Amino acid sequence: MPRRILVTSALPYANGPIHLGHLVEYIQTDIWVRFQRMRGHECYYVCADDAHGTPIMLRAQQEGVTPETLIDQCSQEHQADFADFAISFDSYHSTHSAENRTLSETIYLRNRDKGHITTRIVRQAYDPVKGMFLPDRFIRGTCPRCDALDQYGDNCEVCGATYSPTELKEAISVLSGTPPIERESEHYFFKLNDFEPLLKRWTQGGHLQPEMANKLNEWFEAGLQDWDISRDAPYFGFPIPESTDKYFYVWLDAPIGYLASFKHLCDREGLDFDSFMTPHSTAELYHFIGKDILYFHALFWPAMLHGAGFRLPTAIFAHGFLTVNGQKMSKSRGTFIKARTYLKHLNPEYLRYYFAAKLGSGIEDLDLNFDDFMSRVNADLVGKVINIASRCAGFINKHFQNRLADRLVEKSLFQKFVAASEHLAQHYEAREFGHAMREIMALADQANRYIDEQQPWVAIKDPERKQEVQEVCTLGLNLFRQLMIYLKPVLPMTTEKAEAFFNSQSLTWSDVDTPLLNHTINRFEPLMIRAEKIKIEAMIEDSKEHLQQNTNAVKPTALLAEHPIAETIQFESFAKLDLRIARILKAEQVEGADKLLRLELDLDGETRQVFAGIKAAYAPESLVGRLTVMVANLAPRKMRFGISEGMVLAAGPGGKEIYLLNPDEGARPGMRVK
């Protein structure tokens, strides 16, 4: 019986371009959605631009345009990128829409009327020069725990500590460069703890991946806190009903944007919105997200929906981050690659296939290794799958007037491909795309072996074996057709070319057991060319050039204006720091820590354990064996996860933009930096 399914991907922020890291999620989701449609299910895929918040307001001011103009331009760029990567949204909307405003107000008011909203006075950092309250990320200063310089207003990327902006030492506003002052303001809070019993049942009820459900247990143990859902003017967003100069925090109306985009689709296509969103709906609702935004989607979002009388998600599927060549995406190395830069040089279906080949149902990070990328594309897609058609089509085109034989010469092989259908469908359904790709390539190997054994290029020289050649090539092309059916969720554009070659209608999953016989095909045209190293290298260089252009456009004093040089110290003060070269012997994730990696450092005979807030920037395995610089005489600090016996040095604003110091060749562990 056909299922009714609504699927969403996380909303990209309308303040910058789509890059390859974003595309992991959209490609993963699109493959799953296309598979559901091929199976005959009623499946809708919606998304939108996340178009509210302080960063958008400030960027619009800097560019001298309205926020609406900025987000419209960004939306056009995003949609063009998605279309060229064959992401098949049924609706791509914006959180700055009439539908989203209505739904946000409805959800807020229903929760308020049930007593789930409260207000209280909070003390916040305020920029007197800019005349606005400052989000935590717009405040920088010295960590109150470890004294690391240039840290955000809410957490330290070095030691992992969290704190309030008022605790930050020597704090400054990144907007004006002046110290913020404290000012009181009334804020609105969502009482998340009201929903704790519901959320415990739901998060442990099979709606999340096991590792994600386990992670949520830590938050339950710590106690669910009220969630601040308001921001003060000036702010780009929706005003809170019956309030003055108060706006919904972007994270309140962003997930509601899923429903707004679907409502936009329903109004356009005459669909019944309520039949998908009422508590007892039989429709299915799935959210694909990055593992870093689980807290909002698995706690706040279900609670808000339940409080407003809507149904809860059927499941939330989280995925890991993208690394490139074993390291975080880097602008300096040219591996921070925008979607548009990729499209300028390479076939988008190369990336769709590579991601599919490496994606599973878990939350492990995915590494894009360009040597492996080129090898897999050329060996699997061109060398195996497409090769079957190119080996057989020429004989049919040239010797048989484009006509396929009227029978299958070896039905058992065809049926073997048919028999793989349900197992492959199970892999697709479970998001185990990597398993599916391996099994499909194993089938392609069998098809190529069959052609090798039959040698139609030899048989065609014997006039008495002409019919044999037609039958062998007919079977080969039917096996190729079956493979294209199985690969259609991953390679929709190549499959469309194959459908034109076969002179057939759009292929569905059920077509796999029906051979194409006594049928006229079209002349074969190359369906895909090999990936070339020179084009990959050109893409990387082009990404570096974009960085250079952007760098030249920024005033040379921009960083210093944002982060002024600290007060002058005497040499004696600097000499108190014992900086040493250290080699990273081990690097591993810390269970229960969102930002920390545990490093084991060699100081030439002495080993130190250091916890570093670099998890978002580096895959642990990419750090092993590298040299770095550490503060060796920093007093040991007891943390929840163990004793940290020093500090490694890094530059950058934090998060994924962290750059470990890397000594030049010749430096050895234990050497002092002076």
Curated annotation (Swiss-Prot):
Cofactor(s) for this UniProt protein: Zn(2+)
Residues the entry annotates as binding Zn(2+): C143, C146, C156, C159
GO terms for cellular component: cytosol
Catalytic activity, reaction form: tRNA(Met) + L-methionine + ATP = L-methionyl-tRNA(Met) + AMP + diphosphate
Superkingdom, taxonomy of origin: Bacteria
GO biological process, one term: methionyl-tRNA aminoacylation
Main subcellular location: cytoplasm
Transmembrane segments: none
Residues binding ATP, per UniProt: K331
Co-factor note (free text): Binds 1 zinc ion per subunit.
HAMAP family hit by this protein: Met_tRNA_synth_type1
Name of the protein in its database record: Methionine--tRNA ligase
